[in-house]
Amino acid sequence: MFKRKSTAELAAQMAKLAGNKGGFSSEDKGEWKLKLDNAGNGQAVIRFLPSKNDEQAPFAILVNHGFKKNGKWYIETCSSTHGDYDSCPVCQYISKNDLYNTDNKEYSLVKRKTSYWANILVVKDPAAPENEGKVFKYRFGKKIWDKINAMIAVDVEMGETPVDVTCPWEGANFVLKVKQVSGFSNYDESKFLNQSAIPNIDDESFQKELFEQMVDLSEMTSKDKFKSFEELSTKFSQVMGTAAMGGAAATAAKKADKVADDLDAFNVDDFNTKTEDDFMSSSSGSSSSADDTDLDDLLNDL
């Protein structure tokens, strides 16, 4: 069942997890999401639970790429979840084309996105009271991740005490508050309450009930859940088209599209003055994609 553990042990586990950068995950069975009102606001009280496996951290970090281009979606888990940037065609595309420095718009579209996962006990859920007392998986973003870290990475020399918020006895409930600010969900007012034990946690039958509802988060990042580089490359090429070629090939493709656009822009009189030979080698048509909303909007946000 549950065991007490030191905050130093949790801090070390979280530091190891923090080495991974990037993604989001699609809808997951058993995931709890805060229901928002028509104004985009909502609140609940949850409790982060310890790991189901004593050797694993109580959190999981999953890195993904999710974007739409040329009318097609690319939504795949990224191998950088395990610190491997070479087995992801999107990461290679970003690196080879130096998108961070040369094309900020493209970089923002295809960059890695990170989702954090935990087992939680729903303490209070005003919008869905039927969830109260139940255990779910919960996906959250960096804002909440930073608040969890702030409870552990304290200044001991200044008299601050680190808190393992996942401890069933000495952890703390988390008040999740979401407010709509400038069209985005804002989590700034979310906070941890004072340390407290989960009610009835000393009852072994209650512990067992909670434990059996929890999932092994390490399975989410198991390498056998990730697609091969070849499979991902095929999908990436289908979505990106000529842009996936990168380098000189992509540049040539862009120039060809530019020529086609220029030809389309000729007026009829100019066209009539040209001979058939002038246009024998011309190509027509070009592809473009409009800006799309972030995939997190498609997945109803974090």
From Swiss-Prot:
HAMAP family (alphabetical): SSB_T4
Protein name: Single-stranded DNA-binding protein
Annotated GO MF terms: metal ion binding; single-stranded DNA binding
InterPro entries: NA-bd_OB-fold, Phage_T4_Gp32_ssDNA-bd, Phage_T4_Gp32_ssDNA-bd_sf, SSB_T4
Location of the region described as LAST in the Swiss-Prot/TrEMBL record: 3-7
Any one biological process term the GO annotation gives: DNA repair
Biased composition (Low complexity): 280-290
Keywords linked to the UniProt accession: DNA damage, DNA repair, DNA replication, DNA-binding, Metal-binding, Repressor, Viral DNA replication, Zinc
Entry's free-text remark on domains: The acidic C-terminus is involved in modulating the ssDNA binding properties. The N-terminus LAST motif is involved in the cooperative binding of the protein to ssDNA.
Positions with a binding annotation for Zn(2+): 65, 78, 88, 91
Segments of this protein annotated with the region Disordered: 273-302
Bias kind Acidic residues: ranges: 291-302
Subunit structure: Homodimer in the absence of DNA, monomer when binding DNA. Interacts with the DNA helicase assembly protein; a ternary complex between the helicase assembly protein, the single-stranded DNA-binding protein and ssDNA is an obligatory intermediate in the helicase loading mechanism. Part of the replicase complex that includes the DNA polymerase, the polymerase clamp, the clamp loader complex, the single-stranded DNA binding protein, the primase, the DnaB-like SF4 replicative helicase and the helicase assembly factor. Interacts (via C-terminus) with the viral SF1 dDA helicase.
Family the UniProt entry places it in: Belongs to the Tequatrovirus single-stranded DNA-binding protein family.
UniProt keyword Lipid biosynthesis present: no
Species, as recorded: Enterobacteria phage T6
Function in brief: Single-stranded DNA-binding protein that participates in viral DNA replication, recombination, and repair. Coats the lagging-strand ssDNA as the replication fork advances. Stimulates the activities of viral DNA polymerase and DnaB-like SF4 replicative helicase, probably via its interaction with the helicase assembly factor. Together with DnaB-like SF4 replicative helicase and the helicase assembly factor, promotes pairing of two homologous DNA molecules containing complementary single-stranded regions and mediates homologous DNA strand exchange. Also promotes the formation of joint molecules.
